[in-house]
Regions:
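Hydrophobic, aromatic-enriched alpha-helical segments typical of multi-pass transmembrane helices
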Residues: 1-230
Length: 230
């Protein structure tokens, strides 16, 4: 098996698309964000899917950046670092949510509820320590990084520009959740999921084009040589 840059980039595209699909899927019929839900098997399964989503998204956006590192410039680098940091921290918090919080439900239900409140953008009653900072930085990286990275992708003119716009609008639009009812929390994730799917497919298709063009070019050259020899 030969590992090539094209193959890795196409894999990154598929990873981004898969991350987008999971991001949308986990929002459907999401259980309430409280200690009672954390104690269920569904919570572990759903948040395990979010852990996978975070890992796939990191692979995907890395592939997007490397594909257009020259065209994206400094703005692209800043956006990638912020957005990547946001997803890395999101991956970490989902690991905690899936595998640590369930073990704390019986011991410290109030602490678990406070973390969930903070994760949803609310103000916890008690002290949750460093988790408050982690969640805040995660939100900043996700929103600001997504905005800048989407703008850089749009300006680079390589991947689907509509998806780049949707990524910017969807991520920074998350800030509006502080003013909107809780019922908007899940639907607001859908635009970002669609953007990741669009960008991922665009990256995958972009890597198919050069390979598909080579046989055609070779065929034209062969036909020209045969015609000249007649």
């Amino acid at each position: 098996m030969t590992i090539t840059t094209t193959g890795l980039t196409r894999a990154a595209g598929l990873s981004a698309a898969a991350a987008g699909l999971i991001f949308i899927a986990v929002q459907i019929n999401h259980p309430p964000m409280d200690a009672t839900s954390v104690a269920t098997t569904e919570w572990v399964v759903r948040n395990s899917a979010k852990v996978l989503m975070g890992a796939l998204a990191l692979v995907g956006i890395t592939g997007m950046y490397l594909r257009q590192v020259r065209q994206a410039g400094l703005l692209g680098l800043i956006g990638y670092l912020l957005f990547g940091a946001g997803y890395l921290l999101m991956f970490s918090t989902e690991v905690i949510s899936a595998y640590v919080l369930p073990g704390l439900v019986d011991l410290a239900p109030g602490y678990v509820n406070d973390i969930l409140v903070a994760a949803a953008g609310g103000t916890p009653v008690g002290d949750i320590g460093a988790m408050a900072t982690v969640l805040a930085v995660t939100g900043i990286g996700y929103m600001v990084g997504g905005l800048i990275f989407g703008i850089a992708l749009f300006r680079a003119r390589i991947l689907a520009r509509w998806a780049a716009v949707l990524l910017s609008v969807g991520t920074i639009g998350t800030a509006s959740l502080a003013l909107l009812p809780e019922s908007f929390n899940r639907p607001m994730a859908v635009p970002v999921g669609i953007a990741l799917i669009g960008l991922g497919i665009s990256l995958w298709r972009d890597q198919r084009s050069p390979a598909d063009a080579i046989p055609q070019k070779h065929a034209v050259q062969t036909a020209s040589i045969e015609h000249a020899s007649v």
